Amino acid sequence: MSKIPSVNIKALLDAGVHFGHKTSRWNPKMASYIYGKRDDVHIIDLRQSVALMNVALNAIYETVKKDGKILFVSTKIQASDIIAEYAEKCGQYYVNHRWLGGMLTNWKTIAGSIEKLNKLDKTLENEEALMGYTKKEILDMSRKKDKLLLSLAGIRNLNSKPDLLVVIDTNKEHIAINEAVKLNVPIVAVVDTNSNPDNVDYPIPGNDDSIRSIRLYCSLFADAALQGLEESMKASGVDMGAMQEHTDKGLTSKNVSKLKQAKKFSKTKNIDEETNTEFEQVLNDADENKNSDNA
């Protein structure tokens, strides 16, 4: 049986997941996820981050296991390359530059743009066909292709709406979230102390600005998706030796089943004692180290 990845408080702390924004920038709707404040910066309750991350990872795993498609979204500079790297690693889809309005709700128009991109690709790869164009025309086509690739590279093989949206920075990606809500697409999202968690089905309280934090999230998301892919392939009788090839190409199964939307989590009520003790200990250790440095 595949093992869904999990995370502990120490790993989150090392990645700086506990650092929120300045207290003056907070969103009161995040109050239940905040542990306290230090030096006018909110500290995120990593006990809840651990529990809710594990719930989100299970949602990702189950979606891919059922041949569902996941769309990773983050267009902020520090997340752009990381999102693409890990989405490609697990054979899923991504938007990492500009979210075009209607990417989900006006799919017909987006599909037309993808078709245009594919035609430009074919033309530019056909040396014989290019003989009929001037250098300026070829340059114009190359520029159009590059512009389309920026927005569509990660979804050019996506032929229908995704079954799950994974977002880093809900404020920046509010249009994507609104479109997903309209289409009843469940949402996994990292929610920082200035975020609104209302429309997020699987919130993960955490720092959404740190590169180390973002890389940790994406690594866990990709691993969960890969485990789901492995289970899906086993169920389909696919040779597991060919798994890497399938992962590189992305999911191509036409037998897509939508993940049933799970009950929405507003906060975690049952945090086990071991996790609680670990959180208190790592915070105390951090304080001791800080005091030692300032001595």
Swiss-Prot record:
Biological processes annotated in GO: translation
Pfam families on file: Ribosomal_S2
Keyword Ribosomal protein assigned: yes
Cited CDD domains: RPS2
Keywords: Ribonucleoprotein, Ribosomal protein
GO MF term set: structural constituent of ribosome
Origin superkingdom: Bacteria
Region (Disordered): 261-295
Keyword Ribosomal protein found: yes
GO CC term (a single one): cytosolic small ribosomal subunit
Family indicated by similarity: Belongs to the universal ribosomal protein uS2 family.
UniProt-listed PANTHER family: 30S RIBOSOMAL PROTEIN S2 PROKARYOTIC AND ORGANELLAR, SMALL RIBOSOMAL SUBUNIT PROTEIN US2M
Name listed for the protein in its UniProt record: Small ribosomal subunit protein uS2
